Amino acid sequence: MKVDYYEILGVTRECDDKKLKSAFRKLAMQYHPDRNAGDKEAERKFKEIGEAYEVLKDPQKRAAYDRFGHAAFENNNNGGGSPFSGFSAGGFADIFEDFFGEIMGGGHRKRSDGRERGADLSYNMEVTLEEAFSGKTAQINIPSSVVCDACEGSGAKKGSKPQTCGTCHGAGRVRAAQGFFSIERTCPVCHGRGETIKDPCPKCQGTRRVEKNRSLSVNIPAGIEDSTRIRLSGEGDAGIRGGPSGDLYIFLSVKPHEFFQREGADLHCRVPISMVTAALGGEFEVSDLDGIKARVKIPEGTQNGRQFRLKGKGMPMLRRQQVRGDLYIHITIETPQKLTQEQRELLQKFEKLSNHENSPQSHGFFSRMKEFFENISGKNE
């Protein structure tokens, strides 16, 4: 018995698209075959998750599933192969024609040519910020359904071929009288395919496809952002009976960086400096993500939180890679700790020699604070 799609993804029936996508990505990452090499249970879960998301992400398929459950897609199953398969565009026409045809006694219709589009697949990939900066070509292994090479996709044993169904005569549907109505339904013998296989292919067991790990080369462009989606047309599951292959979607996530934080095409970096450097001024060297160094001059009296902008030292823009964002340096002044007696005495001497011009903000603040409390005391007397 099939598990409820909502239970598979761990969401409620009322969840929105954002929560649905988030749940799918989390589970797909957890059970991805690359992270669970040789684990058949993880591979089964991965495909089960993909099947559930393939239905629930599409408003029409989701509505049909909410109304009919798994029965909404049973007519399109091919009896085997990848659980991702069987969600072709023509499937929902069959569902509603079956539903209304059985009530209203709809007329006979011609069977389609039987071609079914392969299912779309997804792959989660994590890249470093450096890789997002420069771009890369990655090799991935993706489990998918491919056309059986033993029977060339016919599903029949070598030397034989599928036969026209003797029950529906190739139409894929049969009609029966029920009272005053003529009811048309899917052929119970060929399950709507219009043909039967007497001698199934021993390799694919008549399913026309087999499971295979494929190695693909994926181009990651410079400037990609977290949650970028790359579509590889035709790299999903193989179609059935000459139908087109599905697509492969690469979902990218960018790892957090040790030094840089990203906001769009801009980079931000916090740099700690000593209290002395902040007071007397100085300079330091910083490298951007392409390894080019730049010197940052710190003027005398630099305050904590001051920001310096290095123009054109940020990330390349995805669709205008010749244009780069900026790098922002955020200054953090580090207060000295574990002072020696001599250092303590020098600081105390410095404090005695200081006046309000050395610390205008703190002097002004405490003067105003003193005046504030004096006013309160005067009112209470």
From Swiss-Prot:
GO terms for molecular function: ATP binding; heat shock protein binding; unfolded protein binding; zinc ion binding. CXXCXGXG motif repeats lie at residues 148-155, 165-172, 187-194, 201-208. Its main location: cytoplasm. Gene3D superfamilies: DnaJ domain, Heat shock protein DnaJ, cysteine-rich domain, Urease metallochaperone UreE, N-terminal domain. One of its GO terms (biological process) is DNA replication. Zn(2+) 1 binds at C148, C151, C201, C204. Keywords: Chaperone, Cytoplasm, DNA replication, Metal-binding, Repeat, Stress response, Zinc, Zinc-finger. Its cofactor is Zn(2+). GO terms for cellular component: cytoplasm. The keyword Chaperone applies. Homodimer. The J domain is necessary and sufficient to stimulate DnaK ATPase activity. Zinc center 1 plays an important role in the autonomous, DnaK-independent chaperone activity of DnaJ. Zinc center 2 is essential for interaction with DnaK and for DnaJ activity. Participates actively in the response to hyperosmotic and heat shock by preventing the aggregation of stress-denatured proteins and by disaggregating proteins, also in an autonomous, DnaK-independent fashion. Unfolded proteins bind initially to DnaJ; upon interaction with the DnaJ-bound protein, DnaK hydrolyzes its bound ATP, resulting in the formation of a stable complex. GrpE releases ADP from DnaK; ATP binding to DnaK triggers the release of the substrate protein, thus completing the reaction cycle. This is Chaperone protein DnaJ. The gene is dnaJ.
